[in-house]
Amino acid sequence: MYAIIVTGGKQYKVEAGQAVYVEKLNVEAGEKVTFDQVVFVGGDTPKIGTPTVAGATVTGTVEKQGLEKKVVTFKYKAKKGQHTKKGHRQPYTKVVVDAINA
């Protein structure tokens, strides 16, 4: 059984026992988290939400918080001696899916 959840403005396909990296959530490592925006539940009898499946939830445990690899942007203007270098590291939360309740 799998489900498609919405969190942080993105959709993720998850299964029980799977680790998924989502946009940063304001919870500590080791805490439980529940996703109630489930748009699809697959299995023997698939359920499609309009826009979400009523009563369906996905529960998981936060494993860790972290930062992704640095992304560097570099702007350059030829013959002007003008350049700008910026870096960014996107925060994420690693969640291990415990159960899909549909």
UniProtKB/Swiss-Prot annotation:
InterPro entries assigned: bL21-like, bL21-like_sf, Ribosomal_bL21, Ribosomal_bL21_CS
Entry keyword Ribosomal protein: yes
A single GO BP: translation
Keywords: Ribonucleoprotein, Ribosomal protein, RNA-binding, rRNA-binding
Single GO MF annotation: rRNA binding
Annotated SUPFAM superfamilies: L21p-like
GO cellular component: cytoplasm; ribonucleoprotein complex; ribosome
NCBIfam families: L21 (TIGR00061)
Subunit structure: Part of the 50S ribosomal subunit. Contacts protein L20.
Family from the record: Belongs to the bacterial ribosomal protein bL21 family.
HAMAP family: Ribosomal_bL21
Role this protein plays: This protein binds to 23S rRNA in the presence of protein L20.
Name of the protein in question: Large ribosomal subunit protein bL21
Organism: Levilactobacillus brevis (strain ATCC 367 / BCRC 12310 / CIP 105137 / JCM 1170 / LMG 11437 / NCIMB 947 / NCTC 947)
Gene: rplU
